């Protein structure tokens, strides 16, 4: 995202008013169907009609027809979700007092040609929480010198700015949690917090309008920060913008308004729809602040599902669990099945689970002793197969609040747990099969025990009918919420795949294990078993291996 000069006003304010009568499932259908058409050109999708250049156009229904579920299902374009009066027009510029002008010329045509709604309509609120007033906020007027001069913002503390995304506002559950954790910080990290509430401009179902509105909201925040800098002497080097979804991109526009001088931007799963593949001028990127860290938790997956952006957008980009769906949230198959099966509202909520996990991770990282260690790697598969388990000279990184102190840069991978506390200590298990073993298929599990307590149960094959061959080396990375300490033994279980209609019945009924290693990635401790012997694990049975704290190869 780079700075852009705006032309003078040439068109009137185009502010839609619309009844909020569409439920969440309709938006999910609209977004998913739009992606189907853009990516797969599936002509059977009913809600959208795309023109040759890929821009949304009105359908056979008049744009000023009353908006109802019936008219949508009959074939209205997503553009109907934007305004009841008329479709947006190309080459439009709107200007407002204080914030200036905005046009929808390329590349700012990424919001379906929408331009920002007026400041009066969006009604952005700025709530200041300080160390002295942690629950009773001051309301600051962003364009009032008097309001800013009379505010209680400290000149010595960090100023953290929180910007929410679509269909959120200051009452959204995660915002008070994040604010509270930030206000607990001590010493050099001690902070004041400004919560930016632009909920009126982020309301369902007007997603394209919300995409356009973040340009105006970001500029408003930037103007506030400039006045705090000029009037109160607060350094840009002590300003940190934290944004979720659309709010992450709004942080980029905020920093643009102060010539990209912000110390830091933390993007929590920056929004993907209308931003993926677009020029950096319209979305968050690493040039927007001195340090930009990004957590990707719901990147685009099969059939266009996914609310977050896939591209690297920061100095460090974290992809926990691969960045697509998160443990404890529905799988890719469940999401696709929900949409194709007509359960689109459930699918939207399921997708939101992974999308929202990004702020869950960030909130937890602020005051947790668990390090959220992440490793540089080319892709998630390579990481899970144990190919990126050593921190290079350039360094690993710590996902979340403390990433700014990490040496590592670029793409980082880690695993998390399925429920809170999400952070876990990483362990790598490697199982080597004997070269004289008969070929078979099924699933192999390893259960890890300490003091006779089960700590983790890991599938090394990740599916029930995996081919298992002589000499295979099976590897897997998993996490546990505390340091395991001393590991006593593991139990290996082999579940052979069942024959189907006579197929698969000739395969071996056992596996032969010649080596097992368990490595702690945070402290590099290695446990080994079977250095010089082989053990047999019959189908549907378990074998116990005692572990020693050394590497068989040493």
Language model feature labels by segment:
Residues 1-2, 16-46:
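Classical eukaryotic N-terminal signal peptides for Sec-dependent ER targeting/secretion
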Residues 33-195, 202-213, 223-236, 283-286, ...:
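Flexible, membrane-associating and regulatory peripheral segments of lipid-active enzymes
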Residues 200-202, 272:
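Alpha/beta-hydrolase active-site loop signature
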Residues 242-253:
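Glycine-rich nucleophile elbow surrounding the catalytic serine of serine-hydrolase chemistry
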Residues 257-262:
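Conserved hydrolase catalytic core segment
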Residues 263, 269-326:
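The feature captures the conserved acid-bearing segment of alpha/beta-hydrolase catalytic domains
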């Amino acid at each position: 995202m780079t700075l852009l000069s705006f032309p003078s006003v040439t068109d009137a304010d185009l502010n839609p008013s619309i009844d909020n009568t569409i439920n969440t499932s309709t938006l999910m259908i609209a977004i998913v169907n739009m992606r189907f058409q853009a990516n797969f050109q599936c002509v059977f999708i009913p809600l959208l009609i795309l023109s040759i250049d890929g821009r949304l156009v009105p359908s056979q229904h008049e744009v000023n027809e009353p908006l109802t579920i019936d008219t949508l299902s009959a074939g209205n374009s997503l553009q109907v979700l934007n305004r009841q009066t008329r479709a947006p027009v190309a080459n439009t510029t709107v200007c407002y007092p204080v914030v200036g002008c905005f046009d929808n010329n390329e590349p700012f045509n990424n919001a379906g040609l929408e331009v920002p709604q007026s400041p009066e309509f969006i009604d952005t609120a700025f709530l200041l929480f300080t160390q002295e007033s942690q629950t009773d906020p001051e309301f600051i007027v962003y364009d009032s010198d008097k309001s800013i001069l009379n505010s209680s913002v400290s000149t010595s503390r960090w100023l953290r700015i929180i910007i929410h995304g679509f269909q959120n506002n200051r009452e959204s559950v995660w915002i008070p949690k994040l604010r509270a954790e930030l206000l607990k910080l001590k010493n050099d990290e001690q902070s004041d917090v400004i919560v930016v509430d632009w909920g009126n401009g982020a309301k369902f179902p007007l997603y394209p309008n919300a995409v356009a509105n973040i340009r105006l909201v970001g500029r408003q925040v930037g103007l506030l920060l400039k006045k705090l800098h000029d009037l109160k002497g607060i350094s840009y080097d002590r300003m940190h913008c934290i944004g979720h979804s659309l709010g992450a991109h709004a942080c980029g526009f905020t920093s643009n308004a102060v010539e990209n001088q912000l110390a830091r931007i933390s993007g929590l799963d920056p929004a993907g729809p209308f931003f993926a593949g677009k020029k950096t001028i319209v979305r968050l990127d690493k040039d927007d602040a001195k340090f930009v860290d990004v957590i990707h938790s719901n990147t685009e997956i099969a059939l266009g599902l996914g609310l977050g952006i896939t591209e690297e957008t920061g100095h460090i980009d974290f992809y926990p669990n691969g960045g697509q769906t998160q443990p404890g949230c529905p799988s890719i198959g469940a999401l696709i099945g929900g949409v194709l099966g007509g359960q689109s509202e459930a699918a939207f909520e399921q997708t939101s689970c992974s999308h929202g996990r990004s702020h869950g991770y960030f909130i937890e990282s602020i005051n947790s002793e668990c390090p959220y260690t992440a490793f540089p790697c080319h892709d998630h598969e390579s990481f899970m197969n144990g190919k990126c388990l050593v921190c290079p000279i350039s360094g690993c990184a710590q996902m979340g609040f403390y990433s700014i102190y990490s040496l590592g840069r670029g793409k980082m991978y880690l695993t998390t747990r399925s429920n809170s506390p999400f952070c876990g200590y990483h362990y790598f298990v490697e199982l080597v099969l004997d070269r004289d073993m008969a070929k078979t298929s099924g699933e192999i599990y390893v259960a890890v025990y300490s003091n006779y307590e089960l700590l983790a149960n890991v599938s090394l094959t990740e599916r029930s009918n995996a081919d298992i061959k002589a000499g295979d080396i099976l590897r897997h990375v998993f996490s546990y919420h505390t340091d395991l300490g001393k590991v006593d033994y593991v139990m290996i279980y082999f579940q052979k795949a069942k024959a189907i209609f006579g197929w698969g019945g000739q395969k071996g009924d056992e596996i032969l294990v010649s080596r097992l290693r368990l490595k702690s990635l945070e402290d590099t401790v290695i446990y080994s078993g079977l250095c010089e012997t082989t053990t047999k694990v019959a189908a549907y049975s378990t074998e116990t291996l005692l572990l020693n704290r050394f590497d068989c190869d040493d």
